[in-house]
Amino acid sequence: MPSAGARLLAFFDIAPGYKSIKHHLRAASEQQAVDYELLQALIATESGFDAQAVSPKGAVGLMQLMPATASRFGVRADAKRSLEQKLADPAVNVPAGTRYLRYLLDLFPGRMDLALAAYNAGEGAVQRAGNQIPAFKETQNYVRTVLALYHQLKPPAPVQAHRAAPGRVRMQLQGGAHNRGNLPPDTVVAHSRASNEPLSTIPNE
């Protein structure tokens, strides 16, 4: 019987929304050194691969970026398209969203769970929580969902090593999302512990 990951990959491969953006994911993954499978898991959770998705809070597109966040990471309106229209374009949304995710992974090194929590709730929320996952059920469920998908999609270590190109260092992700919170932090709090020390757990419901 196929594994859960294999079944999930098979579902993705027949989903038109996914098939049409695979090349954008691959390019962004390589440019920002973010695992392809992490982008798959995050986008599946955020938008279900619907490039036209708009949240009640105003987040747009595949990676559900808030316009303010997109502006921080290089997206600008022009005479032809508004910022929101640009974010509905996978060629704009995926690179910008991946740049933001890369920033968060660097902000919380070795803590993918905190990076994902920050993607959902905002980095300020994570910092105010003492560099722990904020006590928002939605954020805790988001982190749990993205990580579960990621671990199903990620190939086993021997397969992963076989897929990696010679000489390429693949990022080792260490597992770790309040309603569209990818906004600028309103408070910057210094990291209070070593970045590789476990700071939080996600309670099971």
What are these regions (language model features)?
Residues 2-166:
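Catalytic glycan-binding domains that act on GlcNAc-containing polysaccharides
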Residues 1-12, 23-26, 156-205:
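An acidic, Gly/Ser/Thr/Pro-rich helix-cap/linker signature
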